[in-house]
Amino acid sequence: MSETEVFTISIPTDEDGQVLLKCPVCNDLFKVDGTVFGDDSVFEIHCPSCGIVSDSYITDDVLKLGMQMSENYANDLIEKKFKKLEKATKNSFLKSSYKSNYKRHSEQPIKLSVENMTLVEYPCCKRPSKVKPLLRLCGSYCPYCGEKYYGIE
């Protein structure tokens, strides 16, 4: 079986159009402009807290929903195969029966979470991002280019 299945997960934006992300290195949460994912001028996202670039900034909610969707899909495939086998052996010498006891996971859409974050306009890229208030005071890295920004003009 070489089929590839694609699942779509909608990630909500807040009132400022920001999407919640989580750094896999320092586990810090931050938000970036939701339009950045379709923008070719931004090649990589930097964590505002540690400044490191990662391949994936998936939050725990998105990961959990993706796992539930893929598990439901896999179990549906298995169930279809066993039901097909049950029908194929219905009138033969060797019979097969299948009763599923699998409970599907509910695939609830991701809800917008409330985080205590402040909007920072990075002058290097002229783009907004939301970071924790402490990072605004201590300084943070621009998520779009990685330049250190201390909040002082």
Where would I find each of the regions flagged by the language model?
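Short Cys/His-rich Zn2+-coordinating modules
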Residues: M1-P12, P24-T35, Y98-P109, E121-S129
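Short metal-binding segments enriched for Cys and/or His
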Residues: S49-Q68, N75-K84, K148-E153
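Charged, low-complexity interaction segments
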Residues: K83, K87, N91, R104-L119, ...
